[in-house]
Structure formats: structure tokens, C-alpha cells
């Protein structure tokens, strides 16, 4: 396993401004050149990376008695969630103490549609950990008032936040949740327009409906998290990971804003890391 830490001297100042300002409604295109605080861990393959990620999640959650875990969906975190559940249950850590927050959701689908993020999280985390409804905060996919639904999640975060650990995947266009590339990124939970790329996601292959919109946490919510875990696996994400590590900060690649956060762990496999510069890595002594 390989490991690297990339540093940016301005990150703490910038991230504090983004996370604490209640007046922020948009995060503008910075196009700034900056190093990164991202700790990069390269595992041999998906299985090894998932094991590393699941262990990391369990360690972070055990650090706080009532941790808020924000969970992404999709292929990238599935293996990590299995390891995480096993770790939590085997070490007698009461899962009822965990607050689970859904990162995003497909709007316009029934809640029991197998394509929803709801269905995914119920199967991978909620039911295995027996997380009670009082500790699970979920965008309702079938809400007839999606703006009010986003406000409900925002109000909950204002009272209970910030997120302790936010688990993310890296979109093919650099999106985080449904925060898609744009001239400006919305800070708060919001209704998002779905791109053609998002609508082509494999999760939707099982649905009979076409989602009409996305519901997602905003960039401020993500960046206000105490810790962030980014999972990047497979050769199809190699260009995106290279852009994240070597490129500047721009709203046209939303994931680049993670480089401004002071505690981001990125776990990837060798296939995803194939295009990274040789000088990025040094051997992990652990």
C-alpha cells in the first residue's frame, strides 16, 4: 500500500470561511492553483481498498459516541460499508448511537423503488445496523415539495451538525453528490438539475421511472464535515483522480474543493492511481 500527503497552506482559512458563513449561497469558480491536504492511500485492488476504508470508517465513528455519518451510494462504497458494518457489530459498538445522513437522492421516484439511494442505504447500512428512524435523516425521493424537503434537511443539520464523517465517491465529471460542474456551486441542500451523465448512472437501470431532479447536500455541508473519506476505484476514474491531485480548484470540477479541507482521506486502487505522477507517492510505513 502506498501513501502520500499533499499540503496547501491556505486551506484552513478558506475552509473555515466556507463552512461557517451563513450568508453563502453560492461558491464561485475560483480556478485557483493550490496543493492539497488530501491524504492519498493506494491499495492493490477494490477489495483491499474497501477493507482499508471500512476500518477507517469504524475508527472515526468510534471516536464519538453519537457520530453523524453522511453516506454516499453507488458501487464505490459498497465493499467499505460491508467491512464497516462487520467492524461495528463485532466490537460491540452500539449502532443505535449513530446518526446516518443520506448524501443525495433521485427525485421523482417512489421511496421503495430499487433504484433509489434509499433502497441502497436500507440494504447496506440501515437494516444491518438496525439504525432507528429517529437517527436516520433521509431526503424523501417522492416529496411533492422538494424545496421544503431540502430545507428540512438543512434545518436538521443546523441543529445537529456538523457531519463527523462524510463518505463520498468521485463522479466522472468531478461531481460530489448532485453538485454538478457549474460556474457556481450551491452551498446548502438543494434541488439539482440532473445531467445526462447522471441519468445514465447504473443505479437507474432497475427503475421503471425516470427521475425528474436530484436532492443533495450542498458544498458547504460537505466541506463543513469534520472528516471526509473519498473512495476512488477502477481505471475509469484514473483521469478524474489525476485531475483532483494535480489540478487547481474550480467549480467546473467540484471535487477539487476537497483539497481545501484539512482532513480528507482518499482511498483508491492501483487502477485508479495509474495516471498519477511517480513523485506523488512514498511507501507507507504502517
Regions found by a protein language model. Give the residues of each.
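Glycine-rich beta-strand-to-loop/alpha-helix junction loops that act as flexible
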Residues: 71-76, 168-172, 233
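Class I SAM-dependent methyltransferase SAM-binding "motif I" and its flanking Rossmann-like core
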Residues: 173, 177-219
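Glycine-rich N-terminal segment of FAD-binding domains in flavoprotein oxidoreductases
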Residues: 63-89
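N-terminal glycine-/serine-/threonine-rich phosphate-binding loop
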Residues: 26-69
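Ligand-binding beta-strand-loop-alpha-helix segment within the catalytic cores
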Residues: 27-37, 95-166
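A glycine- and small-aliphatic-rich helix-loop capping segment at beta-alpha/alpha-beta transitions
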Residues: 83-94, 117-119, 181-191
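ATP/nucleoside-binding phosphotransfer catalytic cores, i.e., glycine-rich phosphate-binding loops
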Residues: 220, 224-286
Amino acid at each position: 500500500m502506498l501513501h502520500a500527503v499533499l499540503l496547501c497552506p491556505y486551506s484552513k482559512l478558506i475552509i473555515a470561511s466556507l463552512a461557517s458563513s451563513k450568508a453563502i449561497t453560492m461558491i464561485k469558480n475560483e480556478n485557483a492553483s493550490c496543493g492539497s491536504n488530501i491524504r492519498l492511500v493506494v491499495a492493490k485492488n477494490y477489495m483491499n481498498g474497501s477493507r482499508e476504508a471500512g476500518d477507517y470508517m469504524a475508527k472515526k465513528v468510534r471516536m464519538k459516541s453519537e457520530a453523524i455519518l453522511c453516506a454516499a451510494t453507488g458501487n464505490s462504497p459498497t465493499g467499505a460499508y460491508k467491512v464497516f458494518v462487520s467492524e461495528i457489530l463485532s466490537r460491540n459498538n452500539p449502532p443505535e448511537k449513530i446518526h446516518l445522513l443520506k448524501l443525495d437522492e433521485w427525485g421523482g421516484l417512489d421511496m421503495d423503488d430499487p433504484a433509489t439511494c434509499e433502497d441502497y442505504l436500507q440494504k447496506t447500512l440501515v437494516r444491518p445496523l438496525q439504525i432507528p428512524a429517529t437517527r436516520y435523516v433521509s431526503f424523501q425521493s417522492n416529496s411533492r415539495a422538494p424545496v421544503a424537503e431540502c430545507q428540512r434537511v438543512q434545518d436538521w443539520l443546523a441543529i445537529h451538525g456538523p457531519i463527523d464523517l462524510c463518505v463520498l465517491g468521485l463522479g466522472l465529471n468531478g461531481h460530489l453528490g448532485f453538485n454538478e460542474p457549474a460556474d457556481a456551486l450551491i452551498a446548502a441542500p438543494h434541488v439539482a438539475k440532473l445531467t445526462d451523465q447522471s441519468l445514465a448512472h447504473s443505479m437507474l437501470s432497475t427503475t421503471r421511472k425516470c427521475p425528474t431532479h436530484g436532492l443533495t447536500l450542498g458544498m458547504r455541508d460537505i466541506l463543513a464535515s469534520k472528516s471526509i473519506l473519498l473512495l476512488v476505484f477502477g481505471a475509469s476514474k484514473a483521469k478524474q483522480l489525476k485531475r483532483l491531485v494535480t489540478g487547481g480548484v474550480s467549480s467546473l470540477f467540484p471535487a477539487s474543493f476537497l483539497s481545501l479541507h484539512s482532513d480528507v482521506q482518499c482511498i483508491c486502487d492501483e487502477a485508479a492511481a495509474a495516471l498519477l505522477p511517480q513523485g506523488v507517492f512514498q511507501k507507507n510505513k504502517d
